[in-house]
Each structure stands twice: as structure tokens, then as C-alpha cells.
Amino acid sequence: VKTSLKFLAVLLLVSNVSFGQDIPQRIDSLIKDNYKKNPNVGISVGFIKNNEEYYTAYGNLNIESQIKIDKNSLFEIASITKILTSNLIAQAVVEHKIKTDDYIDGFLPKAFVLHENLKNKIKISDLASHQSGLPDIDFAKLIELNPQQPVNNVTIEMLTAIINNCTDLKDYGKYRYSTIGYTLLGQILEKVYGKSYDEIIREKMIKPLKMSNTLTKDFNVKNRTTAHNPEGGIQEFFKWNITAPAGLVKSNASDMVTYLKAVLNEKTAVGKAAIITEKIYYKDKNRELGLGLNIGTDENNTLYLKSGDSMGQSSIICYNRIKNWGIILLLDQRNSKMRQELLNQICDTILK
């Protein structure tokens, strides 16, 4: 009996090892197959499991270039920036600078004057979980004004006017995706630390994690991908401005895997903060939200994920803390359907 048990244990060990090695090949096969069907959409994928990193990529930096996209190619991560911002908020919580249930009133710069109806109403966690009820930036109008750089027209003056002129929170406590919420979280971080958001994200995330290809203001680098709108037209990368905390960081698969590695390690500052962001702050019949994170649960798994869409690129990040894996998908075209379908296939068939 002992011998057969030993044999079974070895067999299980071997099958686990081969399964572990099998996952990257299966992910690569799926991504390759998708690229063959969609040769105009370049893609870079990073995957980490039990601290082991795997990468795959297809396509070229642009039509003229023969340089292949790889793990170091730069993309817009767009709204994935929001979970970097919420992680910084959670780091401030760990440092006892703020609490998630603090009202925003005392943490906004002086230019913001909340109407009486709004005072002691909106919590920091409300901003981070998209339920503040505040009006948002009118993106359709901004795109009309400047289809290449819509957020360029958003200034601190516009932001303070939107907030200061708000007299009522029509849907407070209900989910409504918000750019302004994360722009305000950036303002709160700046007030708390007495530094710019750019300086804060560098000091507390980019430098300590050595994410040397994660860029803020200056992203004019040789390994930058080209952004394409859904029709295939070329889009500019968004320039840095006040809305940065909501979606203006640029990065690559390698650095985002570095970030995932820190998130999955509860001993790091980023990992400790990530635990706070994973707590459920909003729940209805359609969704559960942490601080910026979408939370997907079934009987076997809890997944934490966040997608990003600029005018010309799509991305998604997802991780499973219990099973100790994380994945980042970066596309050089705005194509949220493709991004979502790829992640679903990977999660449902390969990482189940």
C-alpha cells in the first residue's frame, strides 16, 4: 500500500508540474490563433503563476516597422491606471494618513467647495467604487472637440466648476463608472502627500518595484506601439494631464507582471494595499466592486480584474490570489470585445 501511495504522490507531482508547464503553451496557442484571425491587431501578454513569468506577443510596433511587439513594448494601459491609483489610496490607509470611510471634504484642495447637500456625504471609498453620485466629465463632447486628445481640454478649473456647481447627488450609492471620481482621488493623494500624482506614483510604485518602462509624462520611446481606433485609424497616445489618475499611465507586459507579482505578495507595500482594495465596497445583482477592482466569483474561484480602453488601445488585468496567478493582456487597437473574449477563454478553459 505504501508503495502505491508513493507512486500516486509522484504521479500527482509530475502531473502538476506538466500542467504548470502546459499553461503558457496553451495561452500562447490561443493568442497565436487569435492573431492569425486578426492580423491587424498586435498583442502582448504577460502571465505569472507561483512567481514564474511567461510572455507571448504577436504583431509589429507599426505598419512600417519590422520590429516585433514583445514584453517590453509600450502600450496605454488606460483605465487600468485606476487600480494603481486605488492601490496608492490603500497605501495611504496602511500609513494611517486616511481611512477608506473618511469623507472627502477635508482631503480636497481648497479650490473645491462642496455644496451643503454634499457635505459629509461622499466617502473616499465611494469615489473608488464608482458610487459617489457626482456628475462626470462629458466624454462625448470632449471627443467631438478633440478626437485625438479629448482629455486635453480637462483642466483644474473645469474640474472644480463641475464639483462646486453640483447641488445634488442623484444616484449616490448606485454604480456609475466615473472618471471624475478617480481624478478626485488623485487630488486627495496630492493633498495628503504634498506632492504631485506623478511624483507619488513614482516614489511609491514605479521606483520601488523597478517598473522602469512604466511612464507618465514622457513616453516618446522607441519601443512604443501604435494605437488604432476600431476602424484601424491611427490614434495618438493620450498626453498627461489632471485626469492622469483615471487613465493616463503607459506600461508594458513585463512591468505589469512585476506589478502583479507585488500584488500577489502580501509582504510588499503594494501587496498589503491590494488586500484593502479587494474588500467588497459595492454590490448589486450585476456586480461586486472593491476599490476600482471588479470582483468575479464562482464556486471555485475569486478573480480580481480591471479593463482599460483608450481611443486606440484595449487592455485587461486579472489575478487570482488563492491560486497565485495573474495575467495582463495589451492590444494595440481599441477592441474591448476581443480583449474580453480572450480573457474569458483563458480563464474558462486554461486557468479553471
Which residues make up each language-model segment?
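Short, well-ordered beta-strand elements
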Residues: K306, S315-Q333
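Short active-site loop at a secondary-structure junction
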Residues: K37-S44, E64-D126, L169-I180, A244-G247, ...
